[in-house]
């Protein structure tokens, strides 16, 4: 129980000590990994058909609020004003590096909306030259996405899916169009409410809520795994071409490391390039439906300009206090689950997008994510240890930062020091700055 006159400095210090190593990314035991994979299967199996009335309300709200935006995205893809692309993520079909740019496989589902001759070939000559070694897979020939685990905490791993190369190629292209369109001036108000680009509005709104209680913050459990295919089909119902492209680039089955293969009832697992933006839209629509209920409106009467200040970033939701009791019930209607441990509707604490607030004071903590490095080849671990050092140093925990620095000094003779806040992979310092190592020479491609 928190005292009403709690000292902010003491409160922040206690939280920092207790949470410092709460999310170290270490491999879990085989038993915990198996439990996580079983939970993945059980969650997907638990997704039920959404009742007709709530589903229609969802369609009505989607049409009222997102039709212009989704139509603009659809128009870009339909007209060919887009470029499918790859990301650096691992692939279920195992292509590495440059080989992912020369794949020779497509699917009938994709071909129904996007001809491989248009999306993959640079010229008619290339089409002719590749006809013999190009294959178009029937739906029952498509490989599943590959579900795997990566370290998250010592309690449970994070579960992600690796997509086949052709699916990822299209997903990334659609994501790029969605991102460009949402940044257009005509959709500024929409972007103020939901986003997959900027967390700061969430953090600021959470701060305001901690001061006057005017906003409630919600976190969802298993958010990606609980967004059903049925819900996404309803979201895109008025845009058949866009819906076709999105669903054709979606893996319908998933294969787990246990050997189990399941037909997915969810829209997509974490790892799909469209998982985050699509779920952001879904959660935005549900927030709006909750507001409509509070106002006594039908969802079809909703308008973007008539909505109050609210916010969605992935599964971090913020709504006015007036709908704080309505939203959880609405979320559950659509198969979603509120994480009550990380949701705050009353009291002086609010949390969103990694920022924690108590009566307007920042009580966020820094966390050790990986064990300290032991060798030069641990590039990512070294980079993240430098980041940990800088977070600890800027927060005033100099002895903790010193331990990180000692581990790095055991590998490198000397790491450069730069002013606090500098965006370089170097140790932050308030005073001991190596002035000759704070500029990146673009020609020599090294720090000067």
What residue ranges belong to the model's regions?
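Core nucleotidyl-transferase/polymerase catalytic module
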Residues: 126-448
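Non-catalytic, polymerase-adjacent accessory regions of viral genome-replication enzymes
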Residues: 1-148, 414-448
